[in-house]
């Protein structure tokens, strides 16, 4: 079974909606590790048991991605990417800053790692 490292703090409605998605994924049998502010994530998890790595800093959409990656060493996206580097996860998901994800992947993994897949890709991209 593959494990997905999820940037729980990335996205407009994070972490609440991201945690809800992680709970649904777990219920479908998908292994998830959440990266973000542990105390805040726990407040949305309820009784669900999903592993969390505590990376409390958030990179907002309006921040300069390169500067943010340099100054936010405990950011949730870097935490998720570190899980991938350490082979504790097989993939990373983030709904946060694409620029921070791109620069973070170069910083942590030494390569660009962005991928979009969807069964509906033809409809979405036509």
Task: Name what the model sees in each region.
Residues 116-126:
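Single conserved hydrophobic/aromatic residue that forms the stacking wall/gate
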Residues 104-118:
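A glycine- and small-aliphatic-rich helix-loop capping segment at beta-alpha/alpha-beta transitions
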Residues 1-106:
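Contiguous, glycine/small-aliphatic-enriched amphipathic segments in soluble metabolic enzymes
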